């Protein structure tokens, strides 16, 4: 099973059209089973941004595209447009024993994220149904703070409750975006993978536009960082010794 995670596309003022066209070519060549887009498909939540982004996303030759809104998609009441252009299901059984569950963290007129009591309870009850499968939880906002990103006021405000529910539910992998900073936290039985920005001009530090490639084989999960037009590297290598990538 092969899954691609795109994040923080930011179609609009920050968008790099040439980079995303390269992403389309690379993903189509990779031919994944699914593409997960963890939020901020647009920059300001405007209708014309949704239309332009939809046109580009439709060039991905994949059977399953799972998209969820980010805080930028909620701007200017853009959440009213989201499901029209990017309809999605919260529970996605991909086959081969892999299930992807999405939760919403974006809220109107807020840059921070929140899951809420009811959605957290739903998450726990839902994951119990799939405890014998490989479970992937996808959201926009980062669940845990990420190094080199300054103030961490924009994490999920109820992150402690969500993390507890995630661990109790034996989720195998959490996919996040939001911070434009690739990173991975490894809690032995739980991996939390943060994607960088796929196509925004607002990259952090020495990082480039990138996306993640997730491989699930025999119940084991591997997450690789793929620089657009560049190399593919295990995401865990960056967390272990990311200074090495700066030297490159």
Q: What is each stretch, according to the model?
A:
Residues 6-7, 35-40, 64-71, 104, ...:
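Active-site neighborhood of phospho(di)ester-bond hydrolases with catalytic His/Asp-centered motifs
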Residues 130-147:
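Short acidic, glycine-rich surface-loop motifs adjacent to enzyme active sites
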Residues 12-15, 43-48, 71-79, 108-111, ...:
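Active-site environment of divalent metal-dependent phosphoester hydrolases
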Residues 47-129, 161-167, 213:
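Extended active-site neighborhood of metal-dependent phosphoesterases/phosphodiesterases
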Residues 151-222:
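Conserved beta-sheet core of the metallophosphoesterase superfamily
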Residues 1-56, 125:
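N-terminal active-site segment of His-dependent metallophosphoesterases
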Residues 1-4, 92-102, 128-134, 187-192:
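Beta-strand-turn-beta hairpins that frame and shape the catalytic cleft
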């Amino acid at each position: 099973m092969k899954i691609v995670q795109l994040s923080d596309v930011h179609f609009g003022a920050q968008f790099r059209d040439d980079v995303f066209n390269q992403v389309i070519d690379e993903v189509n060549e990779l031919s994944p089973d699914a593409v997960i887009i963890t939020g901020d498909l647009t920059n300001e939540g405007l209708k014309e941004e949704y239309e332009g982004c939809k046109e580009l996303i439709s060039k991905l030759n994949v059977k399953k595209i799972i998209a969820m809104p980010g805080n930028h998609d909620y701007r200017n009441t853009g959440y009213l447009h989201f499901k029209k252009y990017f309809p999605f299901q919260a529970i996605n059984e991909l086959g081969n024993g892999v299930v992807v569950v999405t939760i919403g963290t974006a809220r109107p007129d807020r840059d921070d994220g929140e899951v809420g009591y009811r959605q957290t309870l739903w998450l726990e009850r839902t994951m119990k149904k799939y405890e014998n499968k490989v479970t992937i939880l996808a959201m926009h906002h980062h669940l845990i703070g990420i190094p080199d990103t300054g103030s961490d006021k924009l994490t999920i405000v109820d992150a402690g409750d969500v993390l507890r529910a995630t661990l109790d539910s034996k989720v195998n992998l959490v996919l996040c975006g939001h911070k434009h900073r690739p990173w991975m936290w490894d809690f032995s039985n739980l991996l939390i993978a943060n994607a960088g920005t796929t196509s925004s001009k607002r990259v952090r530090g020495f990082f480039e536009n990138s996306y993640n490639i997730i491989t699930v084989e025999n119940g084991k999960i591997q997450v690789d960082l793929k620089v657009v037009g560049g190399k593919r590297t295990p995401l865990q290598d960056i967390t272990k010794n990311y200074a090495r990538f700066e030297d490159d």
